[in-house]
Amino acid sequence: MDPNCSCATAGDSCTCANSCTCKACKCTSCKKSCCSCCPPGCAKCAQGCICKGASDKCSCCA
């Protein structure tokens, strides 16, 4: 189990390489943003963020 991922997945392995489906996912291997309103390059989004409406901004990515 990936210590940076708090979500339990099949096989005890983190499978958020393509998309994060759990709010608490902190996988370092997550290539896409865990937050739909954040750009893929924002590393902070894997630590959790709050989207502000339908805008492309969120609490951790300005």
Swiss-Prot record:
Keywords: Acetylation, Cadmium, Copper, Metal-binding, Metal-thiolate cluster, Zinc. A divalent metal cation 6 binds at residues 38, 42, 45, 61. A divalent metal cation 7 binds at residues 51, 58, 60-61. Residues 31-62 are annotated as: Alpha. GO terms for molecular function: zinc ion binding. A divalent metal cation 2 binds at residues 7, 14, 16, 27. A divalent metal cation 1 binds at residues 5, 7, 22, 25. InterPro entries: Metalthion_dom_sf, Metalthion_dom_sf_vert, Metalthion_vert, Metalthion_vert_metal_BS. SUPFAM superfamilies: Metallothionein (SSF57868). The modification N-acetylmethionine is found at residue 1. It holds the Pfam family Metallothio. It comes from the Eukaryota. A divalent metal cation 3 binds at residues 16, 20, 25, 30. A divalent metal cation 5 binds at residues 35, 37-38, 51. GO terms for biological process: cellular response to cadmium ion; cellular response to copper ion; cellular response to zinc ion; detoxification of copper ion; intracellular zinc ion homeostasis; negative regulation of growth. A divalent metal cation 4 binds at residues 34-35, 45, 49. Residues 1-30 are annotated as: Beta. Class I metallothioneins contain 2 metal-binding domains: four divalent ions are chelated within cluster A of the alpha domain and are coordinated via cysteinyl thiolate bridges to 11 cysteine ligands. Cluster B, the corresponding region within the beta domain, can ligate three divalent ions to 9 cysteines. Metallothioneins have a high content of cysteine residues that bind various heavy metals; these proteins are transcriptionally regulated by both heavy metals and glucocorticoids. Belongs to the metallothionein superfamily. Type 1 family. Monomer. This is Metallothionein-2C. It comes from Oryctolagus cuniculus.
